[in-house]
């Protein structure tokens, strides 16, 4: 397995170009199964999960090509089962189910794998599809969905806010007969992006970005060209990199309007922030950040995917900050690793109390999930001495070329190829 060796401490300053959002590209790629004509998707990041998705789509009979953009032609799809071999590495595969049953009347997806953070049941996907008229069976580790004729529009009230299930229901409902209303829908920018993509193909979706999405079913979806929105979590990660190192960074090709809660907390931590239509700059003027209290919650509140980065910020800040995680259990696995680097923190159920220290020291640490591992790499950039981060395949699942981008900001980082 590959590792990163990071030599610190360094101040991170410079420019970084933000990639397309993985969490929008994935649902969009799966939603392309609904299209009867070719689709061109631009700004798709080069990531392991994206490669897996492209493999999965081609196993279903989709023509998939990548040259700059990703080109998808799902007109010849003739296999309706997403096999365990591919699904086990990536839980997003469940998103194949809605489009398959909506367009072809049948679909099977193996129960998914992915990051080891907490319980992420597929129940909400299943109940949503059942409410649209699909019959669902769980057999031999597969979720099997079928419907006679078309799905039927329904009024669906989500038990809890779920990005994944909102995508499944919204995608499937585009080809249902009649109108579907999703109440208590997720409001994330990636949901809005997926809806806008579907509308480009001829869907009739309104209300995306609010907690009530309305989908008027259509008979078919055609082709189109769509550009995936920039990755707000990658943006936030590089802003934190500058904030914890007293540096100055300019993020280009990003969308400040998707990061309100994060920018507010960075300003509270003492960062000087300016924004334009597609850029954000942050300047710490060489100062240490001030500790901030953070509570994760569904969008537009503070995102759980930025929690680990702000835990690190608090651990090197002036003062004490409290971080409360309300979305996933088991999402403080980076904290014991940071404690090995000299951080002072106590975990109490879903809260971590961070006492800022002036400096961290390099150590051997292990990545546990995607965002936690990015924080360990950033910690290595500012720690004294050498840090080795093991199991970085987690990072490769969600950050495109993170070592190249950090190097451009002045980090001393290299990838050590595993056996």
Swiss-Prot record:
Domain of life: Bacteria
Enzyme class, broadest EC rank: transferase
Annotated InterPro entries: Enolpyruvate_Tfrase_dom, Enolpyruvate_Tfrase_sf, MurA_subfamily, RNA3'P_cycl/enolpyr_Trfase_a/b, UDP_GlcNAc_COvinyl_MurA
Places the protein is found: Cytoplasm
Presence of the UniProt keyword Cell wall biogenesis/degradation in the record: yes
Major place of residence: cytoplasm
GO biological process, one term: cell division
Positions bearing 2-(S-cysteinyl)pyruvic acid O-phosphothioketal: 115
Pathway the protein contributes to: Cell wall biogenesis; peptidoglycan biosynthesis
Molecular-function GO terms, alphabetical: UDP-N-acetylglucosamine 1-carboxyvinyltransferase activity
Keywords per UniProt: Cell cycle, Cell division, Cell shape, Cell wall biogenesis/degradation, Cytoplasm, Peptidoglycan synthesis, Pyruvate, Transferase
Cellular-component GO terms for this entry: cytoplasm
SUPFAM superfamilies per record: EPT/RTPC-like
Residues involved in phosphoenolpyruvate binding: 22-23
Keyword Transferase among record annotations: yes
UniProt: UDP-N-acetyl-alpha-D-glucosamine binding residues: 91, 120-124, 160-163, 305, 327
Active site residues of this protein: 115
EC nos: 2.5.1.7
Catalytic activity from the UniProt record: phosphoenolpyruvate + UDP-N-acetyl-alpha-D-glucosamine = UDP-N-acetyl-3-O-(1-carboxyvinyl)-alpha-D-glucosamine + phosphate
Family, as annotated: Belongs to the EPSP synthase family. MurA subfamily.
Described function: Cell wall formation. Adds enolpyruvyl to UDP-N-acetylglucosamine.
PANTHER family per the UniProt record, alphabetical: UDP-N-ACETYLGLUCOSAMINE 1-CARBOXYVINYLTRANSFERASE (PTHR43783:SF1)
Protein's name according to its UniProt entry: UDP-N-acetylglucosamine 1-carboxyvinyltransferase
Designated gene of the protein: murA
């Amino acid at each position: 397995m590959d590792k990163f060796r990071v030599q610190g401490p360094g101040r991170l300053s410079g420019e970084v170009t933000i990639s397309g959002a993985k969490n929008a590209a994935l649902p969009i790629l799966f939603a392309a199964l609904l299209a009867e004509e070719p689709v061109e998707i631009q700004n798709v990041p080069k990531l392991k999960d994206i490669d897996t998705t492209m493999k999965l789509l081609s196993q279903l009979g989709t023509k998939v090509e990548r040259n700059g953009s990703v080109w998808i032609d799902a007109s010849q799809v003739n296999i309706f089962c997403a096999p365990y071999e591919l699904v086990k590495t990536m839980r997003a595969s469940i998103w194949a189910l809605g489009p398959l049953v909506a367009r072809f009347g049948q679909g099977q997806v193996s129960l998914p794998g992915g990051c080891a953070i907490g319980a992420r049941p597929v129940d909400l996907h299943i109940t949503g599809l059942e409410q649209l008229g699909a019959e669902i069976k769980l057999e031999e580790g597969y979720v099997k969905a079928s419907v006679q004729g078309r799905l039927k529009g329904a009024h669906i009230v989500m038990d809890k806010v779920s990005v994944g299930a909102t995508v499944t229901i919204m995608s499937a409902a585009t080809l249902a007969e009649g109108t579907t209303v999703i109440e208590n829908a997720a409001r994330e920018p990636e949901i809005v992006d997926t809806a806008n993509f579907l509308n480009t193909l001829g869907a009739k979706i309104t209300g995306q970005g609010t907690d009530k999405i309305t989908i008027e079913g259509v008979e078919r979806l055609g082709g189109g060209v769509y550009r995936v929105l920039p990755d707000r979590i990658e943006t936030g990660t590089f802003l934190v990199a500058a904030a914890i190192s007293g540096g100055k960074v300019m993020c280009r090709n990003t969308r400040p309007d998707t990061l309100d809660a994060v920018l507010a907390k960075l300003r509270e931590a003492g960062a000087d922030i300016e924004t334009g239509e597609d850029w954000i700059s942050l300047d710490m003027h060489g100062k240490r950040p001030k500790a901030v209290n953070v509570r994760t919650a569904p969008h537009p509140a503070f995102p759980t995917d930025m929690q680990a980065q702000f835990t690190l910020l608090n651990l090197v800040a002036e003062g004490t900050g409290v971080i409360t995680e309300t979305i996933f259990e088991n999402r403080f696995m980076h904290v014991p690793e940071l404690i090995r680097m000299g951080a002072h923190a106590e975990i109490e159920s879903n809260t971590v109390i961070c006492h800022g220290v002036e400096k961290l020291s390099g150590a051997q640490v292990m990545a546990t999930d995607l965002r936690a591992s990015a924080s360990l790499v950033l910690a290595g950039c500012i720690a004294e001495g050498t840090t080795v981060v093991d199991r970085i395949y987690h990072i490769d699942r969600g950050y495109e070329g993170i070592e190249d981008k950090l190097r451009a900001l002045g980090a001393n980082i290299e990838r050590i190829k595993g056996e």
